Amino acid sequence: MPHYNLPHNHGQNIEKVLDKIPPAERFRDIAFLFQQLDVPTRLRIFWLLCHCEECVCNIAAAVDMSAPAVSHHLRVLKKSGIISSRREGSLLLSV
């Protein structure tokens, strides 16, 4: 690990602090996930799915949108790995 010459020494061991920071590429992955939630409607859908699993029709009713519009947002969230889905009989539930 490189030596860091800090302008102020506050008594902390900078190497111990830096060991806790994930690699830069991990932050790029996290930033990408946050970008997917940058659309307020998509964030509302995500919030709903954090609390329950639901079908497209119920999500659409809850956020006052058409089912195709909700499907589009679900597709983006699923493609980015933020949510998943499972089949229950003829229903496809987003989780």
What are these language model-derived features?
Residues P7, S71-H72:
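Intrinsically disordered, low-complexity cationic segments
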Residues M1-L37:
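N-terminal leader segment of winged-helix/HTH proteins
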Residues A24-P68, S90-V95:
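N-terminal helix-turn-helix DNA-binding core of bacterial DNA-binding proteins
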Residues A61, H72, K78-K79:
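Alpha-helical residues within the helix-turn-helix
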Residues D19-P22, V63, I82:
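Hydrophobic alpha-helical segments with strong N-terminal bias
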Residues K78-E88, V95:
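Beta-hairpin "wing" of winged helix-turn-helix
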Residues I45, R75-V76:
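Hydrophobic side chains within alpha-helical segments
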